[in-house]
């Protein structure tokens, strides 16, 4: 990597900036709005957030205040564990989009593999969640989909129905 604008190419051809600005542990509020705006002013083009972080609204506001065109940015957010499952994933996505104030996402990730609330049903819940992700991708609401913090056996489970 030579500079902050260098990119990797994902399996589906979408380019993702090599360097991203993460917003974990940045609380919702004016400080996060400012931090995101300043990161974008410094040249960052990939902004990473998550439902679990509780700051999607401020991240979205920082993006809007930057004055950059949406097409210049790469925005990632992640699904919260307790929102896994087909219908709840679709609802959670709508909520994230509303909080972020965006029309589409560049990358949507399942944040963690095993929702503890589902215990023995985790395999089916994970597959249903992935099916909802595929729908969002097919509808053009998400440019790429993926997994975060998954172990091989979690991935194998999803591959069965992907």
Each language-model region and where it sits:
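Active-site mouth loops of central-metabolism enzymes
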Residues: 17-30, 78-87, 117-122
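Active-site beta-loop-alpha junctions enriched in small/polar residues
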Residues: 24-26, 50-52, 78-82, 110-113, ...
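Structural preference for beta-strand elements that scaffold enzyme active sites
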Residues: 16-20, 46, 72-78, 104-109, ...
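N-terminal binding-site loop/beta-alpha segment at the start of enzyme catalytic domains
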Residues: 1-73
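Glycine/proline-rich, positively charged
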Residues: 27, 89-162
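Short alpha-helical scaffold segments that flank and stabilize functional sites
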Residues: 35-38, 42, 65, 80, ...
